[in-house]
Amino acid sequence: MKSSMAVLLVMGLIIFTLDKCYSTDDKPIGKCGEKQRSKLCRVCHNRSGIDNYYSGCCIYDGTYFMCLDMLHP
């Protein structure tokens, strides 16, 4: 009985550790913790068709300002 409890405890710890490692609660990229910036970067990413535009917009202010220029002609 004690050995089966030990096995269950070890399995529980392994599952808990893996769950924390592969959690989907990632922190926002760069400055996209701000809702407004994240929303604008998503719109520009969709319009540009460039794969990494969203992350570039979130990290670099220059890309963010180009995004603003693209949205407000």
From Swiss-Prot:
Q: Where in the cell is it found?
A: Secreted
The entry's keywords? Disulfide bond, Secreted, Signal, Toxin
Stretches assigned to coiled coil: none
* Changes after translation: Contains 3 disulfide bonds.
Top-level taxon of origin:
Eukaryota
Hey, what tissues is this thing expressed in? Expressed by the venom gland.
Gene3D superfamilies in UniProt: 1.10.60.50
Name any one GO molecular function.
Answer: toxin activity
Q: Where do the TM regions start and end?
A: none
Give the signal peptide, or none.
1-23
Q: Name one GO cellular component term.
A: extracellular region
Q: Which family does this protein fall into?
A: Belongs to the scoloptoxin-03 family.
**Protein name, as recorded:** U-scoloptoxin(03)-Ssd1b
Q: Look up and give the organism this protein is from.
A: Scolopendra dehaani (Thai centipede)
